[in-house]
């Protein structure tokens, strides 16, 4: 039969979907709407955190408020039964200023440093290191136009992608 799935496969998919829904609901109770956007996608949950929640303007190290936010979600991430948690860093297309140019030649390096700092903090808060990875995309994956201040603000973000949940 073409297009049929076994009852066992169907039940496993229903259980997995329920796990993603539970994770999404738990994260929504831990974070305010102004702190993060949470989306449940096919096979993953994505948290989008705006850069000012985590970093000083042009900075790459997570500030105290950002550390507090990450500490709030770390226990949930630690117990999420995920096989992979990828922290992705993104920037706008404004070139790196002279103060940071020697450390970060481009937005690519800045976005990677931001993602890496978030990973370090999550690991320090108890998220298993073997689940964590950091990736930087610079200005290569904008979610809004870089032609306006509002669009650039949307593009400066960190996304935490939780995937491969197991029962």
Enumerate the predicted regions with their spans:
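Bacterial Sec signal peptide processing site at the extreme N-terminus
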Residues: 2-22
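Short small-residue beta-strand/loop micro-motif enriched in glycine and branched aliphatics
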Residues: 6, 55-58
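Heptad-repeat alpha-helical coiled-coil signal-transmission segments
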Residues: 17-20, 24-27, 31, 38
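Charged catalytic carboxylate motif
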Residues: 19, 69, 114
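Periplasmic peptidoglycan-binding/anchoring modules of Gram-negative envelope and division proteins
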Residues: 25-33, 47, 58-89, 93, ...
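Soluble periplasmic/extracytoplasmic beta-strand elements of cell-envelope proteins
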Residues: 37-39, 44-54, 84-88, 117, ...
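Periplasmic OmpA-like peptidoglycan-binding domain that tethers envelope proteins to the cell wall
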Residues: 59-64, 90-167
């Amino acid at each position: 039969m073409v297009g049929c799935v076994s009852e066992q496969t169907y039940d496993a998919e229903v259980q997995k979907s329920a796990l993603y829904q539970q994770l999404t609901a738990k994260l929504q109770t831990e974070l305010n709407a102004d702190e993060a956007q949470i989306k449940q996608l096919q096979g993953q949950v994505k948290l989008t955190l705006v850069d000012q929640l985590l970093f000083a303007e042009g900075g790459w190290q997570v500030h105290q408020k950002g550390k507090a936010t990450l500490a709030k979600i770390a226990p949930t991430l630690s117990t999420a039964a995920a096989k992979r948690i990828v922290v992705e860093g993104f920037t706008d297309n404004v070139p790196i200023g002279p103060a940071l140019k020697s450390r970060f030649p481009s937005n690519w390096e800045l976005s990677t440093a931001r993602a890496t700092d978030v990973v370090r903090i999550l690991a320090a808060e108890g998220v298993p290191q073997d689940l964590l990875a950091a990736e930087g995309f610079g200005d290569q994956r904008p979610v809004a136009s870089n032609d306006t201040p509002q669009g650039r603000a949307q593009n400066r973000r960190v996304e935490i992608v939780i995937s491969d949940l197991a029962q």
